[in-house]
Amino acid sequence: MTVTLNRGSITSLMSSSQAVSTLQPVASELKTQLENKLKSESAEKTREVLWQQYYASNPPDHAVLEVLAMPVREALLARFGQHQGSVVPAIDLPELRSVLQQFDSFGKRWEAILLQVLEGIKPNESQVGLPYLSELINKELMILLPSNSIVDSLLHNSHQIDMDT
């Protein structure tokens, strides 16, 4: 078999090899993004399975909750661990919620995680930001606990007729 190359085919071969070399970094970046997406999806699925296991156990399995709370605790300590002074709710609570939103989107889960994190961070003098983080979590729990109770009450008691009216 004989292959003949002319000037036009050589130019097109060169341009296609240049295109391949140009597309290689883009392809590797897309591959990395896809791998990260798959890892995050598998992490989300793992968290969901752990939450199902936690809710299915009677009494609730605190070891599972500790596994669920560990990455949240690390993220909160990384974000708020060095803060000092008093909590500014208008600024700090939305930041706390954005950190929590990265892990779960349900208020009832936030409540369980925050209570576990609060139990795990006993304020002491060796770490500077722990009293700040404890105060911040307490302020968020003062909002979460009543609102979760209201939602829970509406979900469980909405079928009952109110006889007082």
From Swiss-Prot:
GO terms for biological process: protein secretion by the type III secretion system. InterPro entries: T3SS_YopR, YopR_core. Induction: At 37 degrees Celsius in the absence of calcium. Belongs to an operon involved in the translocation of Yop proteins across the bacterial membranes or in the specific control of this function. Its main location: secreted. The keyword Secreted applies. The keyword Secreted applies. Pfam families: T3SS_needle_reg. Keywords: Plasmid, Secreted, Virulence. It comes from the Bacteria. One of its GO terms (cellular component) is extracellular region. Signal peptide: none annotated. It is found in: Secreted. May be involved in the regulation of the assembly of the type III secretion system (T3SS), also called injectisome, which is used to inject bacterial effector proteins into eukaryotic host cells. May control the secretion and/or polymerization of YscF/SctF, the principal component of the needle filament, thereby impacting the assembly of the T3SS. Involved in pathogenesis. Belongs to the YopR family. This is Type 3 secretion system regulator YopR. It comes from Yersinia pseudotuberculosis serotype I (strain IP32953). The gene is yscH.
